Amino acid sequence: MSTKPTTTDLEWTELDQRAVDTARVLAADAVQKVGNGHPGTAMSLAPAAYTLFQKVMRHDPADANWVGRDRFVLSAGHSSLTLYTQLYLAGFGLELDDLKSFRTWGSKTPGHPEYGHTTGVETTTGPLGQGVANAVGMAMAARYERGLFDPEAAEGESPFDHFVYCIAGDGCLQEGISAEASSMAGHQKLGNLVLLWDDNHISIEGDTETAVSEDTCKRYEAYGWHVQRVAPKPDGDLDPNAIYDAIEAAKKVTDRPSFIAMRSIIAWPAPNAQNTEAAHGSALGDDEVAATKRVMGFDPEQTFEVSDEVIGHTRKALEKGQAARAVWEKAYQQWRDNNPERAAEYDRVAKGELPKGWEEKIPVFETGKGVATRAASGKILQALGAVVPELWGGSADLAGSNNTTIDKTSSFLPAGNPLPEADPYGRTIHFGIREHAMAAEMNGIALHGNTRIYGGTFLVFSDYMRNAVRLSALMHLPVTYVWTHDSIGLGEDGPTHQPVEHLASLRAIPGLNVVRPADANETAIAWREILRRWTKEFGKGQPHGLALTRQGVPTYEPNEDAAKGGYVLFEAEGGEPQVVLIATGSEVHVAVEAREALQADGVPTRVVSMPSVEWFEQQDQGYRDSVLPPSVKARVAVEAGIGLTWHKYVGDAGRIVSLEHFGASADGKVLFQEFGFTAENVASAARESIAAAQR
């Protein structure tokens, strides 16, 4: 770890300092006006954020989505005013009235930064540590994108080279997800990642001595990061010169991510509130805000005071952005001229289009043969990988079980890794046993853009990922989770590994599409539909979770209506259906066998396979009624999990064959038999439903 003296080339004027203090005043006033929020960190971090946005980062405030920009992630999302004040000062589109409406209905400045809501916000943060993992994912995506389009360029010479900056607080680094992601970043030697730690020693319960005593800098050194600690000024304020020097030094270290520890005083320079936990999540109070303004030379009677000189000075970021962009555009055009085929491929990817003929590469599976849907998914991924180069991903150390290896000869690993398949631009990601970080890194990869990401683990371990999965839905991100071993059918590993509540729980997340295909051909159609929904023509992206079997299941004729989420797999014979059997995944073949028994008894029975409730609900009412006729009240839903999903579909006369308790350690076939997932039990439930419907 280095602690460098300040020998900076930073140009820092009185107007720069006044702009920093203006950001502090705006943060204090915004929280005071609404009566709640987090003023302290936004006040103390103002010099660091200002230095990044005004002196360091390559960005164009006139076009926040410029592909050549550096990325900024505020992992400490509660300190959203740290970001909002800089977006306002730099001219990203926020105005003073937006800061005045902080945390109010319909404003552009919600309590925590929200991707897609506020221009210039790169990711939704708030749950602590998520942003750290998002930033790691962005840095990974930048490297993979470079490998797709400009792998031969010298370090720092490609138009695809840029930095990812992240500000994290004490709470972020206490969360387990940041440990997982930071370990991954060090292992991957992500030299394009710079993490600035706001080391203010304050948490909600007081000094961080209440919960933390480790040496965080040594921890990051152990992860393989380049670590620097910058000292504050004698008065306790952050030193922009020292921060600038540390960032510039970090940018020169290309074989490791960089960690910069900034010792700060929360709510500096508030005379009474600084260095207190009260300043973390509460308004300072009118008297303290006024006193703070006096300390900095502002009129205590004015609110939201921004001088013309300050805003004129900070809005020069627009001119700087245009100049930086002009330099980049020249390099980008030279790359295009030198690489016309790659440029054409880049244009396709940037437009969100898929290669011509990609659908033809998806295999069709032979009927009758028992194939595990996880195995089918693996074959489909490899087929897609041959024609969709931007598709990449991996597993949380379960690749052989999840069947997620898209290319066995190409692992995403840094130069110098001893494994023979190691390639800095490889396609197969080894996320390690870090499920939570994997999901959040996938979010970062999707946010970065220009690649298509998937990641796998057992369905039961989706619990480890849940917060990041929820955020992927909140942000409408096109990520795909490959969750295998999706029921008691996994067998002997027992109830710790057998998902029971998971399907219903995941379906409860708004905007997440859970897809549980019945067989290999439904799996193929599901992958095709997922990729189709990733294209820009489809509109807003959505995350998908594939729930796949460990065990083999019968393969049926492919039916394109599987892409609608629910369809008639087998129609009733001998008249209109008296009962409809609805099933998903490995239970579909149980419903099919039950239909055969019912038909043999003269009961016309329809089987509906419903791989995705969410896709089905997106169809028009006419289609849904054609699959589940309102006139047929006798219905049975069959799924090896809790039955919460199915009450609305079966109605008062319906029955649900479900699993309302944990599983057990035994062969999967034995468990299906013991827990009632048999043709006989489903047929019996159907007869009960028919009787109930006739009452």
What is each PLM-predicted segment?
Residues 2-163, 314-543, 552, 564, ...:
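Thiamine diphosphate
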Residues 67-68, 261-355, 614:
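Terminal amphipathic helices with adjacent charged low-complexity linkers/tails
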Residues 166-167, 195, 394, 516, ...:
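Residue-level marker for buried hydrophobic side chains located in beta-strands
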Residues 170, 279, 365-366:
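Intrinsically disordered, low-complexity segments enriched in small/flexible residues
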Residues 171-177:
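Short acidic, Gly/Ser-rich segments with clustered Asp/Glu that frequently serve as metal-coordination loops
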